[in-house]
Amino acid sequence: CVSFYFLSIKQLGATDELYIKMNSRGKPLTEFEHFKAEWEGNIKEIEPKLTEEQKNNGEKTLSQTIGHKIDVAWTDLLWPYRNSGTGTAADDIIDDEFVKYFRFLADIIYCKNSIPLNSSNDIFTITKELFGSNNPHAIENVKTIERGFDCWLNIDIESLFGSVLTTHTTDKPRKCIVDEPVNIFVEACHNNGDIISGHRRKFPLGRTVLLYAFVYYLQHKDTIEEAQFARRIRMVSNLIKGSEYELRENNLANLIRQTEYVLDNGDIEEGYLSFNANQLIEEHEKVEWLKNNPEKDDVLCKLENHNLLQGAVRVVGLENIDLTDRFYSLFECDWALVNRALLTIGDYSQLVSWRYQIGSANNESSWKSIFKTNKEDLKETKRILIELLSRSNKFTDEVLNNIIDD
């Protein structure tokens, strides 16, 4: 398949500019350079014209500003992350990284404008739709892209993510446990828009929402304090982990809206569908509970971080938060013994889909599906679990065998 790119000389401006863009290099333009020229051309068509006074004061047009940022500030931003591991010459330039992050921001624009996400890999189609003269929001869309890049400038990106996220349990329980890599910005620059195994995103929708939370925070640091963000990003992370079936492209606009509300207010906005309803209720209950129990924030975070709970603590209950260490020690034991010990107390099974589920000896997903059931249906399971946790300060296989034998 042979592709041809059409560049309007009129849009590109003077012939000397065209010469610089094409001939001085002695080689054809890359796809990224075509995209850049196309985008700048779109901006020139829609940008406000400068007055003579503005020109005399040295002010730049919007297209000039964006073009300069692409060439300098935004290139410097992406340069440390230019190697996406393709093993090609593309690893020495930031073209792919720029386009992938640009597409992330474009997806946000689609959602905010209530437009279905463009599933096309054609960046030129996306550029025309969002920044063409026929789009009444084109100027604001350009500003959204500009803010989306600018917010990362002069930021220690690794430290930002590392201050609130981790991939494993640490002695700082307030950090959210997430999948690798912790630096979601870099992951987006390398993987966003790529599809694997049919329609599965290489950069999952949950990571899209989590990255947007950081972008939103960086753009609103004047109203969201650092400590507030640390608590609120945990809420967002919990909601993402508890919303497997709600993380859909046609629901992304609602997920973004709820994320913004959480970051702005530290609570849940009710009245519309977004994340999983059970997890939304639980996160609101935690907010109210922490108002009266602020000293227990660390232990709550520790319980949320347990791999079998992943933010959903309703099977233990906020009123039983002091049993957190016992819960950890219980599930450090042989899970087959944990299952048998629970069954000696009662039937703790849950109806999951079409069958009744109990915990497996070696499959963590069975436990997770039980523990994430809605609060009402969990009552008996919770009663049995708390009864077991009350029988020992610390659990071992020997302790569980004694409980089973008794």
Please tell me what each predicted stretch does.
Residues 1-406:
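Flexible coil/loop and intrinsically disordered segments
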